[in-house]
Amino acid sequence: MKAVFLDRNTLSERIDVDIPKGVVQWVAFQKTAPDEIVQRLKPADIAIVNKVKLDESILRQLPNLKLIHLTATGMDNIDKEAAKALGIEVKNVAGYSTESVTEHFFMMLLSAMRSLKTYHANVSDGTWQKDGRFCLTEPPVFELHGKTLGIIGVGNIGKAISKVAEAFGMKVLWAERQGRVPRSKEYTDFDKVLAQSDIISLNCPLTPETKHLVNEE
């Protein structure tokens, strides 16, 4: 069995990528251009990718391919319907980034609520030192405590974000799927979540149904 990794450079060199069990031939390319994909995957039973796009036109040229394994959670770069029709399994790495994404979310949220970028610049360029009051009042800053956080997509990451948000003293609303009646008292109507939330966290996979889920309207 042969496995080909098309974009090894999307993972840090500090991360060891072990050869999967049962794989006799293993090839890892640092990066792969669109016009190199078919040639490199032609003899492969397994394709390992992170960001490389595999659409129907490509998959139809790979009769030996049995499995596409992503080194990430999102699978929107793979034509899953075409893969299914051709008998190719598609797998991802579920749950590996729950804590990391949760921490990153709150890092970005705190930075935005506290206008960290602006105030850091004000200290760096001397604005704060020259003010004379030893304080700045613009732009305004906001606390997380007491704010309402709407979560769209209540999987592992959504639930982890909920837990941390509650520790900050935030009110958390779980959004039911758009157009559906809330399945339990834990969930809130989708439109009500949008209307009542100070902050919204999108944690759902990118699919045709979720694309532009939150739009100008």
Model-derived regions: residue spans:
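Short beta->alpha connector loops at strand-helix junctions that form conserved
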Residues: 30, 71-72, 88-99, 176
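A short, aliphatic-rich alpha-helical micro-motif
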Residues: 40-41, 59-62, 144, 193-195
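Rossmann-like adenosine-cofactor binding region
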Residues: 54-59, 171, 177-217
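Phosphate-binding beta-alpha-beta segment of Rossmann-like dinucleotide-binding domains, i.e.
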Residues: 86, 94-148
